[in-house]
Amino acid sequence: MRSAIGIDLGGTRIKALAYNLDTEEEIKRTMLPTEDGQFFDEDPAWANSIRELILEWETHFGQSVDSIGIASPGLTAKDQRSIAFMPGRLAGIEGLIWEDFLKTSAKVRIANDAHAALLGETWKGTAKGSENVILLTIGTGVGGAAISDGHLLRGHLGRAGHFGHISLNPWGNPDICGTPG
């Protein structure tokens, strides 16, 4: 059985899904609290929760998974192995190389959460078959993504289609990252 694990790392919750790539069926699903700001040994508690979950599921399946996709807020590094920029929350995420941290043989890729949501919608969701799509995510934060002519727009800095951190009132209270209004 070829299998994959998808993880949505949010500001308040971690959602995870194990998927059989051969039958295209869900195997298992769970949700955990993020516990941002808490640490276990020297590692963030949320990162340890993800590592323990993957080990538990691999033991349950009796084999290692083939690939792991992690959707996270923030800007991904160009090589899609880590989050390059995530100010204000999820302490310890910037620069964390997931393949090394998870100690797994699986292929691990990181994506901005809005990008991942949009790719999922065009793969299996309501935007399946669409060539031009815009998606707005609203959760602990606000994000967005766009596909034009069938291609995910990333932009030079990975921010294309990203709606977060738009100042509506330059004299307003700052958000968690310090942007006013």
PLM region descriptions:
Residues T12, A114-H115, R159:
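A generic "binding-loop/recognition-motif" signal
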Residues D36-R51, L55, S64-I68, G74-N132:
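Glycine-rich phosphate-binding loop and adjoining helix at the ATP-binding site
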Residues D8, D113, G139:
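Active-site glycine-centered loops adjacent to acidic/histidine catalytic or metal-binding residues
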Residues T12, P73-T76, G139-G141:
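Short glycine-rich anion-binding loops that position phosphate/pyrophosphate groups of nucleotides
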Residues S3, K15-N20, I27-M31, Q38-D43, ...:
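Glycine/GP-enriched mid-protein hinge/lid loop-to-helix segment characteristic of carbohydrate kinases
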Residues A4-S72:
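Conserved phosphate-binding loops in N-terminal lobes of ATP-dependent enzymes
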Residues E25-E26, T76, S82-I83, L152-L153:
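Hydrophobic "anchor" residues
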